[in-house]
Structure formats: C-alpha cells, structure tokens
Curated annotation (Swiss-Prot):
Domain of life, source organism: Eukaryota
Lineage: Eukaryota, Fungi, Dikarya, Ascomycota, Saccharomycotina
Quaternary data: Associates with mRNPs.
UniProt keyword list: DNA-binding, mRNA transport, Nucleus, RNA-binding, Transport
Family statement: Belongs to the YRA1 family.
Region (Disordered): 1-63, 143-196
Pfam hit, one: FoP_duplication
Major site of localization recorded for this protein: nucleus
Listed name of the protein: RNA annealing protein YRA2
GO CC, alphabetical: nucleus
Listed InterPro entries: FoP_C (IPR025715), Nucleotide-bd_a/b_plait_sf (IPR012677), RBD_domain_sf (IPR035979), Yra2_RRM (IPR034396)
GO MF annotation terms: DNA binding; RNA binding
Its biological purpose: Involved in export of poly(A) mRNAs from the nucleus. Recruited to the coding sequences as well as poly-A sites of active genes.
Compositionally skewed regions (Basic and acidic residues) per UniProt: 149-159
Amino acid sequence: MSVDEHLNQGTGEKQYRRRDLRNGLASRMGLGESTYRAREYGPSRRSRFRDRRDARPPPPTHQRVRFLNIPLDVSDYEIDDLLKDLPKPLYSKFYDHEDSRSAVFEFEDHSILDKCVELYNGLELHGAKITVEIFEQQGRFADSTRTNRSTDHVEKEAGFKTGRPRGKARATKKEKPPQPTLEDLDAELDAYMNGN
C-alpha cells in the first residue's frame, strides 16, 4: 500500500484528480453538474427567452421561381435575357453547383411566376433541359426588422450618426489669431521699453 492510498484511506476523501480542475467549481463543492446548470438556466430564465422569441412576428414567406439544371456554360446574362420580356424582378440570385447552376427570382406580381413556369419549364439551353418551379422561401427577418436594418445601413453610408458615440469626441480646431507682423512686434517692444 502506498503512502497516498494510506492517507486517503484514513481521511475518507477521494483521491484528488487533476481533471477535477477542468470540471468547474460545482463538482469540487459536491454539487452535481446538473444542479449547477439547473440553477443557472432555471425555468424562469428559459421562459423569458422563449417569450421574447415568441413575441417577434414570424418572418414572411416569399413566393419565388427557381430555375434548376442550368448548364455551367450558361451565363447569368443569358438567363436575364430570357426574362427581359417580363417585369424586372424584385430579387434574383444565381448559384453554382458542382455539375449545374440554379437561379432564383421573385416578382412583385405572383402571376408572373406561373408564366415563368409555362414559358421556361423544359426549355433546352446548351443541350440540357432546365426545370422551372415555384416555391416558398422563408424570410430571415420580419419586414419591420429588415426595413430598419436597411435604413440603418443607408443612414450610415449617408453619414448620419446613430446611437451614442464611443470614447471622447474630437475637439474642434479653434481658429488661431493671425500672427503679428514684424512691425507690430517692434512697435509693441518700443512701447514697453519706453514705458507707455
């Protein structure tokens, strides 16, 4: 029996393990990790976060049209030329994949989406038939949040300051009085020397 085993046997304590330092204070105080976490994130704290999350309006969905299986050698401009007879899209994005490309468009008038499917579904481009379908895409933010974020971005670019400034504001330069000329300095010195 080693000395450490003998000493630990007499005191009834567990042998100290270096790993305990990484486990946090709760394990060394005899509290289980679950007790510590339950106190930290109790039901009242969790419900506050849930309430705040539920209070936000759900993000809007956007009905968009998706062009799939576009060959890699078809440029964005060729797809734009296909749509030149239609009104200008509110949203357009092109995606490159390993073996093909895809494009997503959103129009203000949803009837144009059906027209896109009728006109371009099954169209052959550079030897491949493209697929056109309508789908709903979940927006990231509610309209008010998106509008505020874009407004903030525009204001910052235009030079408007938002929020409180960080740190001290720079002092404005005070206009210095004009430097006296040599004649003015000589006259001042003569007046001083003569006691006038």
